[in-house]
Amino acid sequence: MDGIIVIYKEKDWTSFDVVAKLRGIFHEKRIGHGGTLDPMAEGVLPVFVGKSARACDMLPCEEKEYVAGFELGMTSDTLDITGKVSEKKQTYFTKNEICDACGKFVGDILQIPPMYSAVKINGKKLYDLAREGKTVEREPRPVTVYEIEVLDFCEKTQTGKMR
């Protein structure tokens, strides 16, 4: 079988878990995906099967869109909800203040990848190194943020979309 399959990746599956499952279903070794989604993320994952796997690196699958809930004033050791809360403080912001702050991140920025991310350094995923208790030097990487939109706002939690 040759072609592109658009899969909805469930939370707690890695992108490689999806590829491994499809390799078993299709009895095909040549399967790749169009961009890593972190294990806690769910969403669309383009998968390239058979001869199409060669096109995987040629197609622009780098642009992603995230919809996420967030709570201001809370920090965890993993920088997401899967980690142990390390700090929690009261914050009081209006929706306009949050929207104005988000606007400062739109455009071309340099981002240091967090230790709990799927970015690879020397062939190892940062989140694997972090789980081993290791921290490595990470170089800032150019990232383009096209838009950030606050979708839902209440005093304690917010939902936003980032592309």
Model-derived segments and their meaning:
Residues M1-R163:
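Catalytic/RNA-binding core of pseudouridine synthases
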